């Protein structure tokens, strides 16, 4: 079995951002030489997410609005975690809700997506250095 491990590093300009990382994931799949297998893409921080969805700016804004309005409003006084001196409980809850990692099938050496699917990094507490692991496995 072949395998490849690669890390993507991010320092976002904003506290919250959604970044399309599909091209980087596809490049690592190609570099690995795996024709049939899986690629795991995982945020290595507990205040970030990796997810699959559509690359459409209106949807991105809808996601951010949903997280702020329904899931985990950025209200430091609302969370017990913030009583410890932290201010990012909302980011932890957003990561928990959106998801921490994805596994994408590889078929004929390429990411095997449905229509419109892309891989995204969701930063919920940014402006500092963070990373994502890409782990390609297969034959």
Predicted segments with their positions:
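Active-site histidine-anchored catalytic micro-motif
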Residues: 1-139
